[in-house]
Amino acid sequence: MKEATDVFNHWAHLGKDEGMERGHANAVNEMIDVAMERVLEGRVAFSAVDLGCGNGWVVRKLSQHPACVEAVGYDGAEHMIEKAKEGDFINTYHCAKFPETKPEKTYQFVHSMEFLYYLKDPKGMLQSIHDDWLEEGGWAVIGIDHYAEHEESLSWPEALEVHMSTFSEAEWIQMWNDVGFQEIHAWRANARDGKPGTLAILGKKA
């Protein structure tokens, strides 16, 4: 099996990151809109981090929000981080190894799209997001396209020769409960035209 970071490094060279951005935009926009209703409740400003940020497109989007005071991106693929830095001189990007990497500070909003299931221990990373990355009272939203109910996605690990951790919607939601998240809300973002959509899960560190 290939390392996921090697696959994404290759895709960055091929320019596939731009296609990923277009393909994920509708789901991500919906996820952020839903999350912001909670993040900005009783708060006039927020800091944000995108884990598995790729070429930085979500970081750039978040930084343009009028209430965002800081937006940071982390990714394990070196060439993705290079592309992010080349296209953005304002925000900060880090090449990181997960789940080992821990932040120097906590954030009020954590976003992640198509990242968690590439890890062999996604629950451990989710625990770290809750314990290490989020400020108390902060919110996390995570998008997952590879899950048991999305039957088309079940062939992806073999097709890409990359490890993917496969769980059902209920199992993913239970992980959020297990690691301590509260006010958990799960839905399928951008579900249309007979497609199951992105499993989006939102939760708060209380």
Predicted regions and their residues:
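Conserved class I S-adenosyl-L-methionine
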Residues: 1-40, 148-149
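Class I SAM-dependent methyltransferase SAM/SAH-binding core
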Residues: 49-51, 55-100
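A conserved beta-strand element that flanks and buttresses the S-adenosyl-L-methionine
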Residues: 111
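A short glycine-rich, Lys/Arg-flanked "PGG" loop and its adjoining helix->strand segment in the class I
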Residues: 123-136
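Conserved beta-strand signature within the Rossmann-like core of class I S-adenosyl-L-methionine
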Residues: 137-145
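Short, glycine-/aromatic-enriched active-site segment of Class I SAM-dependent methyltransferases
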Residues: 145-163
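Short alpha-helix
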Residues: 164-179
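Core SAM-dependent methyltransferase catalytic element
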Residues: 188-206
